[in-house]
Amino acid sequence: MKKLVLLPIDERPCNYRFPYLLALDSEYEVVRPPLEIMPHKKQAGDCARLLAFLEEQMATAKAVILSLNTLLYGGLVPSRVHTDSYETVAARLERFCELRRRYPQVRVYAYTLIMRCNRANNNEEEPDYWAPWGYRLFRLGYLADKAEQAGLTPEEDA
């Protein structure tokens, strides 16, 4: 049986459990990090332990499917609210690149999500400042894009 390593974007069943279940009747054994090192909402996953998990599993893997949001920031929501330095994030990426060089036979399917701009004053999955400023920040981005793409109405330009 071929080993497929899965580093999902977060702990939700649609990302952590369902891909695993889909592969049960396939030629692949899917291995995932333990839930205790995965993210939970705004709480980042343990990036050091996630990298250690990848290092341990890649030696015998056929392929790796990994979320760069999880690898670099500890998860989807943590990628929106992190305070990690550039150097910290770059070091995580470099460590994965070292694994990639060590195991060139392992196919890597990496993905990331484009940052969204929530249009509500809700900081449940956003930085704390989003509660008072979310809609206004969304509107500013919307109007800037509209001005560039199609132009603003006089009311919008006021």
Indicate residue ranges for each PLM-predicted region.
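An N-terminal assembly and electron-transfer interface module characteristic of large anaerobic redox
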Residues: M1-A158
